[in-house]
Amino acid sequence: MFNNNSNNGNSNGNRGYNNNNRNNERSQGYNQNIEQQLASQEKKTAYRRTVDHGNNMGRWYINRSLGIDDQPIGKIRPESSYLIDLLPSPAYASNSVRENKNNMSIMDIQTKFVHLSSNKAKHSINTVKWTPEGRRLLVASHSGEFTVWNGMTFNFETIMQAHDSAILSLKYSHNDEWLLSGDQSGVIKYWQTNFNNVNIINGHSDGIRDIAFSPNDSKFLTCSDDSTMKIWNFNNGQEERSLVGHHWDVKSADWHPNLGLIVSGSKDNLIKLWDPRASSCVSTLHGFKHTITKTKFQPTGTKRLLASVSRDKSCRIFDLRTMKDILVIRDHETDLSCVEWHPVHPSMITTAAYDGSMNHYIMDSYISDNNIKNDSNNNSTSPIEASHKIPYAHEKAIHALEYHPLGHLLCSAGADRSARFWSRARPNDPMSFQDALYTNDKVGAWYYGVNNNINAVIEPSTASVNKDDPSSAQAINLPGLNNLPNGNESTTNGWGNIPGLRGH
C-alpha cells in the first residue's frame, strides 16, 4: 500500500509539472506574438520643439579661446541663415563696446512664444523657479502641487503633492543645495534637490508671500499676510528676529545679494528698508498710491538699484545711495503684478500686469553705467518706452516671471493655469509676432501644449441665429458635412434637386 501511494503521488506531481511547462510555453509564445506585432507596426517619428542653447554657447567659447570676444559684436542681418551668428546672453553682456549693449534690444530680448505647459488637472499658478542648473522648471500651483517640466523640450517630467494648501513662494539657496517653499497656511518646508522634504516649520499665521536667503545662506527671510516679516536660522529652523513696521499685508521681500539690507513692500503702499542685525527700519520709500506687489534688488552689475511695481500701474527704479526713485515707468494700462531683472544684463527688466500683458525695458538709454541719469534736466517721471511689448501674453493675470540662469529663456505663469516659455526670436522670422499673443485673434489660433501637441483654441462663434427665420440656418456649418441641403432650397417645377429626377 505504501508503494502504491508513492507512485500515485509521483504521477500527480509529474502531471502538475507538465501543466506548468505548457503554461510557460503558452505565455512565452503569447509574448513573442505581441513583440512581433509591435515590431511589424510602423513607428511614427515624434517631432519635438526644442530650445538648444548648446550651439551658440559652443561658438562663443570658441571665439573666447581665439581672442575674438573683445572685438565689437555687430547686429545680426535680418535673414534666417544668419541665425548661426546669434550668441548667448553672456556674450553681449561681457562685450566692452557701449554701442553693442544697445544692440541687445534686437538680439537678446525674449519675444518669441515657444511653448505652453499645463497640467491635466489645471490650477492657478502662483510661482515658478528654474532649478539651479537650468535643466528643469519647477511650478507651484494653488492646489499645493509641485510640477517639474523639462527646460529644453518642455515635456512633463513629474508631479507631487508638496503642501496641503496653495503654494505662494519658492526660493533656492545661493549654494544651490536647498529649496524653501511657503504656503497659504503659513507653513515653511525644507527641500533637498531631489525634492526630499526634511523639515517643516509653522512660521506664520497667514500666507507666506515671499522668501529670501541671506548672502551666506545661514539665514532666510519670510514675509506674510499677517503684516510681519521674520528672520530664521536656517540650520535649526528657529526664529531669530521679527521685523514689525508695516500696517497691512507684506506682499514682497528681498535680501540684498551683498549688503546687510532687506527690502519689503506692503499693502500699505510703503517700501521699507531694514537692517537685519538691528531689526529696525532704516528708511521708508514713498511714491506709490496703491499696494506694492513686488520688490527686487538688482542681482548683477553695480547692484545699487531696486525695482518695484505696484497696483497703481507704475514701476519705480530706486537708487540705494540716494534713497530716491530715478525712473518711473507708466507704460501699462492696468495694475502691475510682478517685475524681474535679467540675470545677465544689469539694465534690463521685465514687468507683467493683471491683464496678462508683459513688457521689456532696457534702461541703458536712461541710466548710464554708474547708475546716474544721463539727462539731469529731465525729471524722474519722464516717459519711458518699452523695448518690446507682448499685449496678450496670458489670458488672465500674470503671477510669476522667472528667467533662465543663462538668460536665453523666460517663463511666465499666472491665473490662466498655464506656464508659458519665451525665447529670442530668429532673425527675420515672420511668424514671431503674428500669433494670438500679439494679435489676440484666438479664432483658429494654436499653441504648442503638453508634449508639444498643438492645442487648438477656438472661441465660440459670435454669429446669432434667429430661430424664427429658417434662412438663418444656412449660417451653421457642421464639421465634415459641407454642402448639405438645409431645407430652404428652391423647388422649381415641384421637384427641386432630387437625385434621379432631373429634367422634370
Curated annotation (Swiss-Prot):
Gene3D superfamilies for this protein: YVTN repeat-like/Quinoprotein amine dehydrogenase
CDD domains reported for this sequence: WD40
Keyword Calcium: no
Biased composition (Polar residues): 463-475
Compartment list: Nucleus
Start and end residues of each stretch annotated as Disordered: 1-27, 463-504
Keyword Nucleus among UniProt keywords: yes
Pfam families: WD40 (PF00400)
WD repeats: 120-159, 162-201, 203-242, 245-284, 287-328, 331-373, 393-432
Source organism superkingdom: Eukaryota
Species assigned in the record: Debaryomyces hansenii (strain ATCC 36239 / CBS 767 / BCRC 21394 / JCM 1990 / NBRC 0083 / IGC 2968)
Cellular component terms per the entry's GO annotation: chromatin; mRNA cleavage and polyadenylation specificity factor complex
Amino acid composition bias (Low complexity), ranges on this chain: 1-22, 477-488
Function: Required for 3'-end cleavage and polyadenylation of pre-mRNAs. Also involved in chromosome segregation where it has a role in chromosome attachment to the mitotic spindle.
Gene encoding the protein: PFS2
Protein name per its UniProtKB record: Polyadenylation factor subunit 2
Principal location: nucleus
Organismal lineage: Eukaryota, Fungi, Dikarya, Ascomycota, Saccharomycotina
Gene Ontology biological-process entries: chromosome segregation; co-transcriptional mRNA 3'-end processing, cleavage and polyadenylation pathway
Keywords: Chromosome partition, mRNA processing, Nucleus, Repeat, WD repeat
